[in-house]
Regions:
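Aromatic-rich peripheral "rim/lid" segments of glycoside hydrolase catalytic domains that contact
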Residues: 82, 92-94, 155, 340-349
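Aromatic-lined substrate-binding rim segments of carbohydrate-active enzymes
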Residues: 18-99, 122-126, 228-236
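Hydrophobic targeting/anchoring helices
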Residues: 100, 243-349
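Polysaccharide-binding and catalytic clefts of secreted carbohydrate-active enzymes
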Residues: 96-264, 268-282
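Conserved, mostly hydrophobic/aromatic
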Residues: 4, 25, 33, 62, ...
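Boundary/entry segment of secreted carbohydrate-active catalytic domains
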Residues: 1-14
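Short, well-ordered coil/turn segments that N-cap beta-strands
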Residues: 1-2, 29-31, 63-69, 131-136, ...
Length: 349
């Protein structure tokens, strides 16, 4: 597979640009494009009002040129109406402050209304495009991660703890709560470990037992959201493979557990300036290893710069080719990029 992440909704008013993009993709021998990763607000600009004609047009044109679609579900970037109407969808940070609308990947995974609205848009997409001849695979959400410290998450965490430990005596023993007088006598006494309680700095804890269990709970909670979307598209398109893009040595999620619910592994390779070829190789090996050595998909890499580094080193000539060949040598069935056309503004321009 050869292609990359394509966000044509940025140029719907410029059909000449879209036509030129497809011409150049075809000329480059590309055979797939990832669509719709951040398109929820374009699909559903107002609650219950859906617009898919533009995506039909793009998929039709890509398919006519021998380019298949990896169709993403857009749950990683919520529309403004969702946050305005249902503020409980907005994540609460480690200081207890509920975030405003903005950024991406900052929703509360425990909010029932978030899961409900995600289910609506995902089912709409599956019904609308499940039979399209150009549909190659489903790409669920995008780079899952993040933590929320709201009341919904706190209640869900207590339920998770009850299921794991059964009794407070067992929990207190496992966490060694008698030290520093942390012993719990009621389940409702347990609060989330954050910067208001057990944490100091962002990722350091005074009370490791509760922090480790919260991270396990969080990984499973996010996995539940992924599985909800996985099952939704599988119910409509059982023969279309499903994946989500992982992130190498990302500590927040238990990728070994996640691999059980992915038809194949895909991941995004964005080396930091200091990462050696050996470190990149080890990331590839981890991604291949979590699903028994099966080949994986390199879903994203950047031919230019990344948005999260404070500065980016200039790539030496040939480095992009070397990174691509290295991925294939370690078992990747693809060489793919982000983005096919660079944005003219905002974060990832």
């Amino acid at each position: 597979m050869h292609g990359g992440d394509y966000n044509p909704e940025q140029w719907l008013d410029r059909p000449d640009i879209l036509e030129e993009d497809i011409r150049m993709m075809k000329k480059a021998g590309m055979n797939c494009a990832t669509l719709g990763v951040f398109s929820w607000s374009t699909y559903e600009p107002r609650e219950g009002e859906f617009h898919f004609a533009w995506l039909h047009d793009i998929m039709d044109k890509l398919y006519a040129n021998g380019i298949y679609t990896i169709l993403a579900t857009p749950s990683g970037a919520r529309p403004a109406w969702l946050d305005e109407t249902y503020p409980e969808c907005r994540r609460v940070d480690s200081y207890g402050v509920r975030e405003h609308h903005g950024v991406r990947h900052n929703h509360c995974m425990s909010a029932p209304v978030y899961r409900k609205k995600v289910s609506v848009i995902v089912n709409k997409l599956a019904d609308e495009f499940g039979n399209h001849p150009g549909l190659l695979m489903w790409h669920i959400s995008n780079e899952y991660g993040g933590e929320c410290y709201c009341e919904n998450c706190e209640k869900a965490f207590r339920v998770w703890l009850k299921e794991k430990y059964k009794t407070l005596d067992a929990l207190n023993k496992a966490w060694n709560t008698r030290f520093w007088g942390h012993t719990f006598y009621e389940w409702d006494e347990i609060v989330l470990p954050d910067l208001r309680s057990e944490h100091f700095e962002y990722d350091r804890s005074q009370f490791q037992g509760i922090t480790l269990d919260y991270k396990r709970f969080n990984s499973e909670s996010i996995l539940e959201c992924y599985k909800q979307e996985y099952e939704a598209v599988k119910s409509v398109t059982p023969d279309i493979p499903v994946t989500t893009n992982l992130m190498g040595f990302f500590k927040m999620l238990d990728y070994k557990m996640w691999a059980k619910y992915m038809d194949f592994i895909s991941w995004d390779n964005y080396p930091a300036n200091e990462d050696s070829p050996a470190m990149i190789a080890m990331n590839h090996e981890l991604m291949r290893g979590i699903k028994g050595g099966q080949p994986f998909i390199l879903m994203e890499q950047t031919p230019s710069v990344t948005n999260w580094l404070p500065y980016n080193a200039l790539k030496r000539p040939g480095v992009m080719r070397l990174w691509s060949y290295q991925a294939v040598a370690h078992g990747s069935d693809s060489v793919m990029f982000f983005q096919m056309r660079r944005s003219v503004g905002a974060c990832e321009k």
